[in-house]
Amino acid sequence: MKLIKFLGGVVFFTLMFSGYSEQNQVNVLCSTDWFMVTVHPFLLNNDVFVHFYEVHLGLGCPPNHIHPHFYQFNYRVTECGIRIKAVSPDVVIYSSEIHYASKGSSARYVIPVSCAAPRRSPWLTKPYSAKAPSSNMGATPKNDTSYHVFTLPEPSQQPNCSCPPYVFNQKSM
């Protein structure tokens, strides 16, 4: 019975990790500003090594980051003939192609690549009205050109927290 459980576990882990051993040949990421494609040198299959000078994105844009195990195309969405299509008020699809032309043979391939991105960047927030500073905020007097953003306590003052002594370079007593 233990042998059957052991063999079942081996088969389970083999199947689970075999999916992770395969590497994606093309990965695409995008935003409202950038289109990034990462290509593995064994793009076509495991027998043909694709050199960086044999591939380009869209209308002739070469890879701009070349590493031993991948080539990366990083371009603005307005470059390289990247096409933009709004599919909803909130989502845009960017698309292009990876073109492969072998220097050693007449082989040529075109691989379509696309990516969806939100129209609004999650990093940008809606504008809001600024409130007048409250009484506890530092304000600059009308005739003064500088102000203190914060002040550090004097060394003789004890910190107002329950921090361990080593945080403030104090020795335990």
From Swiss-Prot:
InterPro entries hit by this protein: PLAC1_fam, ZP-N
Q: Which GO terms describe its cellular component?
A: extracellular region
Write down a Pfam family by its short name: ZP-N
Q: Where is the signal peptide?
A: 1-23
Q: Does the keyword Signal apply?
A: yes
Where found, per UniProt?
A: Secreted
Record key words, sorted: Developmental protein, Secreted, Signal
Give one GO biological process term: placenta development
Gene3D superfamilies in the record, alphabetically? Zona pellucida, ZP-N domain
Q: Has UniProt tagged this entry with the keyword Secreted?
A: yes
Q: Which family is this sequence assigned to?
A: Belongs to the PLAC1 family.
Main role?
May play a role in placental development.
State the name under which the record lists this protein. Answer: Placenta-specific protein 1
Originating organism: Rattus norvegicus
